[in-house]
Amino acid sequence: MNAGSWKSLLLISASAAIATWFSMPATAAEELRIGFIAPKTGIFAQLGIDMQNGFQMYLDEHKGELGGAKVTLIIEDDQGRPDTGVTKANKLILSDKVHMLVGGVLATTGYALAPVATREKMLYIGSIATADDLGQRDFEKYPYMVRPTFVPSQPSHPLGQWACEQGYKRISLIAADYAFGHETAGGFQKAFEDCGGKIVQKIWPPIGTKDFGPYLPTIKSDIDAIFALMVGPMSLQFPKQLRAAGYKKPILGGGTNYDEFILPSMDDGVIGDVSSFMYSSALDTPKNEAFVKKYRTAYGKVPSYYSEANYTTAQWIDETMKQHGGKYPGPLPFIKTMQGIKLDAIRGPVSLDDRLTAVNNIYIKKVEKKKMFGYDKDELWNTVIKTYPNVSQFWNYDKAAFLKQPVYSRDFPPCKFCE
């Protein structure tokens, strides 16, 4: 073969290679498999629906990708039961081969799933299901769990301080009798008594209580206010039955009492009631207004904290995956990266402390009936009346001293002023 023939052959080969290269499909995005646990049936079903909608809305906004990875979202119904949550988590890990678990609702579910994550070395982002000791005394046992929203006592510490600032001296406490109720109420009691207030009574109705008739007559009359912590349908029934029984004094509550998952179903009797949380759909910022309008258009209701928390969880996963080029790095490297990210979230600035628990603004909110965000109808909204910025799970307490005390429970703090 002469030199000219060789040159022709080389040109043909090069042209063919270039054509083949240009015709090759783009590299497919990495797959990120997420196991999402939430109640879709049972008394907590609406909470689970809000959770799923918040997470899905972020996914839809980002064309089903987080940080460049194509998301496969596998949703399992835990029915609001910790034992069912464990069964579903095992299925997601062992059969579905997910990269991470997200969700759960009850604090008791958080306590149940954290050991599963440790045993299987599986990242677990407890977007809702969380509990104080998972980020406190038991933190070292559960290095694979992240709490991107809060722990139960975190919003109630500032509310205890706020109650003192209002001049309240004597308060009765009534809370659902399980971990979330104990820890939320305990945080309020400690902060309130540390600034001079007195909890004079503690009442513990079982979780899921519908009839508060046996409890209402026992509430003391010589008090300045009630602190209540209710969850699920309890949140709707308690204030209605309390007001019907003639109680007219202030009601203070945990955020789940008046959260937007239930607020639209309440009547005007809750106007003026106060609660504390890290989110309100009435947060008057351009970012939240846009979020509320988009969510309401998509799902026919205003977003709840269950919605926002899971939207923000998806945002945090997105930002973390971006820093790893869309490739899941494994649970501990993922957590290390996530811990270094400070989000400008819908609810405001949020970051993780050194024990993988969110640091948030905590908002004191009052139920008001008014128009917001251009809607032409008067509706119930949780108006923000005070902001406590950058609240950690340890509030204003020394962390080492705080960790030496027992976890908040039915018996701690002790009811030293009970009558």
Task: Specify the residue positions occupied by each region the protein language model found.
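Extracytoplasmic "Venus flytrap"
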Residues: G35-Q56, E76-D83, V105-L106, I174-H182, ...
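Extracellular/periplasmic Venus flytrap/periplasmic-binding protein
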Residues: T87, A131-D133, Y142-G246, S281-A290
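Beta-alpha junction/loop-to-helix N-cap segments that form part of ligand/metal-binding clefts
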Residues: E31, Q46-M51, E61, E65-Q136, ...
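Bacterial N-terminal signal peptides that target proteins for export
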Residues: M1-S13, W21
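Extracellular/periplasmic ligand-binding modules, especially the Venus flytrap/periplasmic-binding
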Residues: G187, G232, Q237, L283-I341
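Periplasmic-binding protein-like
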Residues: L92-V105, I125-S127, S172-A175, Q201, ...
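Solvent-exposed, acidic/polar segments of extracytosolic/periplasmic ligand-binding ectodomains
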Residues: L32, Q339-E419
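Sec/Tat signal peptide C-region and signal peptidase I cleavage site
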Residues: W21-A28
